[in-house]
Design a protein with these regions (language model features):
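Short, charge-patterned binding micro-sites
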Residues: 16-27
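Short, structured active-site "lid" loops
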Residues: 30-52
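Aromatic- and histidine-enriched alpha-helix N-cap/loop-to-helix transition segments
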Residues: 64-67, 97
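C-terminal cap of thioredoxin/glutaredoxin-like
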Residues: 1-10, 14, 34-35, 74-181
């Protein structure tokens, strides 16, 4: 997404989507496929697209409850540190297999990117951004989002891990609608 934004001078707006609201606060153990181990690189389409984008995605041991992470992300947005916090959360989950449902993890990641841990803790303890995260989730549902990642570019909705070339085609289509004829 960074490359696309730079190549086309796009503004990207990230929104929270609570993929699995049924996950308990302690998370759930991720089932492994035959021969798979925690920490293995993801394979298939997701692994290929991640590798193409220069991202590492490893099999995490746990599917975390991400409610607090979404609220922490809203806090990071207000402080102008969303992208840094988002990247730190991505690395923690997909590279290091860390549980993003743990307050201590989120506070540590926040501190790493320059957020005040005590202020973040107070925000998370009070549920200050809970309604905003819920509104974003409801908005996504109303748009037909059922999974992540999902994208809306110029009114076109698509979901799933996509290559840079796919994004590029969509942006070109939106920029030059007459090419569709």
């Amino acid at each position: 997404m960074d490359r696309l934004a730079q190549d086309y001078s796009l503004e990207i707006t990230y929104k929270s989507y609570y993929l699995r609201p049924d996950i308990p606060p302690e998370g759930i153990v991720r089932p492994l496929k035959d021969g798979e181990k925690v920490g293995d690189s993801l394979t298939g389409h997701i692994g290929e697209v991640a590798a193409e984008a220069g991202l590492t995605m490893r099999r995490a041991p746990l599917t975390p409850n991400t409610r607090m992470a979404f609220e922490a992300s809203e806090f990071a947005k207000v402080k102008g540190l969303f992208e840094q916090f988002h990247r730190a959360c991505y690395r923690a989950l997909w590279e290091d297999g860390v549980d993003l449902g743990q307050l201590s993890v989120l506070l540590h990641l926040g501190e790493q990117v320059g957020l005040d841990a005590q202020e973040m803790k107070n925000i998370l303890d009070t549920g200050h951004y809970e309604s905003q995260a819920k509104e974003q989730y409801d908005e996504a549902l109303s748009m037909g989002v059922t999974g992540i990642p999902s994208f809306i570019i110029g009114g076109y909705f698509f979901s799933g891990a996509q290559s840079y070339e796919t994004f590029k085609k969509v942006v070109e289509m939106v920029k030059n609608p007459l090419q569709l004829l």
